[in-house]
């Protein structure tokens, strides 16, 4: 290792090194240690594995063409206070609207432009953990790479925030493109909530159990826009 004040041949600048009685650790190494801490959380990694499994289903069934669809999962209850307080890779990315019911919450979110087949293979290379700020007005990217979340993050967070504010414990928002449902929406009669709901209930009896309040229909809006978020 070269002396302090000059970068070594691995690109680590030792001007940022601090001394510990037993260790010499660079800022780069600290980030790696944070990742090790998270990877050692068995409950967290089991949930990440389930996300990968679901992403695989979306891909194999053709319900997420190209980079279509996205996933966000609230992981807050699976993390220790130490893990929730890990330093950010990217800090204070502003949100258009304060998410007051999500302050301090941590989510796994698939990345912008990422494909489900790749999420299934490596969730952390195709998504990131984000932490909502204490005031709910911004978020940090925590791990494992500074991958920007899906462009539809505002819609996801608005749904999470709404449900949380209502005392609901729903932790997952999954946006997908089921082929048959999309086909039905191209037929004008099914653009009526009651019509499509009753049709689905009659075709699949279990649907009434899983979706007891029916299926909502919202007008078309450009994905990721404020209008899209509000309509959802």
Q: Where are the language model's segments positioned?
A:
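Residue-identity detector for glycine
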Residues: 3-5, 11
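Serine residues within intrinsically disordered or low-complexity segments
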Residues: 6, 26-29
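Intrinsically disordered, low-complexity segments enriched in serine/proline and basic residues
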Residues: 19, 29-33
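Hydrophobic alpha-helical signal peptides and transmembrane signal-/tail-anchor segments
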Residues: 21-25
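Glycine-rich flexible loops
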Residues: 33-231
């Amino acid at each position: 290792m070269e002396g302090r004040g000059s970068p070594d041949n691995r690109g680590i600048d030792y001007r940022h090194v601090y001394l510990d009685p037993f260790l010499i650790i660079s800022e780069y190494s600290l980030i790696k240690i944070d990742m090790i801490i998270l990877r050692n959380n068995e409950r967290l990694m089991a949930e990440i594995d389930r996300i990968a499994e679901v992403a695989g289903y979306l891909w194999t069934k053709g319900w997420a063409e190209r980079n279509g669809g996205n996933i966000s999962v609230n992981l807050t209850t699976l993390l220790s206070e130490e893990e929730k307080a890990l330093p950010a890779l990217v800090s204070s990315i502003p949100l258009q609207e304060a998410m007051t019911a999500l302050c301090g919450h941590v989510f796994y979110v698939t990345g912008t432009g990422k494909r489900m087949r790749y999420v299934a293979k490596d969730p952390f290379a195709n998504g990131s953990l984000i932490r909502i700020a204490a005031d709910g007005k911004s978020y940090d990217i925590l791990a494992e790479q500074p991958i920007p979340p899906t462009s539809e993050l505002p819609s996801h967070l608005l749904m999470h925030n709404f449900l949380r504010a209502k005392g609901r414990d729903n932790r997952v928002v999954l946006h997908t493109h089921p082929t048959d449902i999309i086909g039905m929406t191209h037929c004008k009669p099914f653009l009526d909530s009651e019509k499509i709901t009753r049709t689905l209930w009659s075709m699949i009896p279990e649907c009434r159990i899983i979706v007891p309040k029916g299926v909502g229909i919202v007008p078309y809006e450009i994905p990721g826009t404020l209008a899209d978020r509000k309509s959802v």
